[in-house]
């Protein structure tokens, strides 16, 4: 009798362990479960173009950090291409994105700060990029560039650029699987996304620079980021002045 009880308990524990493993697997590998957190106001972006006029080699050769921009507005297609290059879906069957991610945990959240009269077809404000719908979620109204620049130690190119792309991260999406080493993976992924942005901007005749010098708490408060999202990059983008 005691032996039978032990066998039954072993079977039960095996089933429970399998259920937990399956639950964890689908928690880690279903980035589509990350739902928008603020509003139902979405702006659909035009489909990204996958056949450009500049080769990867030429984009690498031409890539530079640009800090001076004209006042010419960006188009929705420009923003569509940039956000797709950073975090867009490139394999809808498996929810894979343009930038590689450790274990497909996808910790990054991407936003854009749009200035007044800085884009055709898009009002000033803060928007969150939804990769699965390839659309923008309107989060905040108003031109936040001056406040953003102030929180970034007064770097004027942030205020002068038509738009600023913000890359933030939810570390727990990756550290839940990889522990402390996941922090490194998150930072690597942010670099992958930023390099994609550089090359896409270059291919479209745009200029940008990555900024890492800012007060984290001020950026978090200004953009009203959820407490689990930490800002990693501010990236001003515009038409190069020269």
For the regions a protein language model found, what residue spans apply to each?
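Short, low-complexity patches enriched in S/T/P/G
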Residues: 1-9
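N-terminal amphipathic, basic helical "cap/leader" segment at the start of enzyme domains
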Residues: 9-13, 21-161
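Small-aliphatic-rich amphipathic alpha-helix that forms the alpha element of a beta-alpha
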Residues: 63, 82, 110, 163-173, ...
